[in-house]
Amino acid sequence: MSMSDPIADLLTRIRNAQMVAKPTVSVPSSKVKIAISQVLKDEGYIDGFQVKTEDGKTELVITLKYYAGRPVIERIERVSRPGLRVYKASASIPQVQNGLGVAIVTTPKGVMTDRKARATGVGGEVLCYVA
């Protein structure tokens, strides 16, 4: 079965796994999902991730992070979706919770946080908000 929005599927799997306090979550792998996972790791929202290949299928295994028994990610939501793409210039990329959260943006220079996109002066598609 084909998936219409694989990024939304990744975010939903992370959200659902954290609600039941799972230590890891597995999703089908892609370059964009790996880049999003790298941003989440760099920002301290997940402990890490691994790419595993089994029977010709690559799978991304994300190790979730908890603090005092509660998930570090309080809110993770998709912004740009297949039916309504959201593009922003570098100056108009929104701040999430007055800078406490991050917006993950895909730009011509790769997937990065809203702060890095503003600092480098590039805009792009706003994939999701994480807080």
From Swiss-Prot:
UniProt keyword list: Ribonucleoprotein, Ribosomal protein, RNA-binding, rRNA-binding
GO cellular component: ribonucleoprotein complex; ribosome
InterPro entries with a match to the protein in the record: Ribosomal_uS8, Ribosomal_uS8_CS, Ribosomal_uS8_sf
RNA-binding keyword on record: yes
One GO process term, biological-process aspect: translation
Pfam family, one: Ribosomal_S8
Molecular function, one GO term: structural constituent of ribosome
Function text: One of the primary rRNA binding proteins, it binds directly to 16S rRNA central domain where it helps coordinate assembly of the platform of the 30S subunit.
PANTHER family xref list: 40S RIBOSOMAL PROTEIN S15A
Similarity section: Belongs to the universal ribosomal protein uS8 family.
Oligomer status and interactors: Part of the 30S ribosomal subunit. Contacts proteins S5 and S12.
Matches recorded under NCBIfam families: PRK00136.1
Protein name in UniProt: Small ribosomal subunit protein uS8
Organism: Variovorax paradoxus (strain S110)
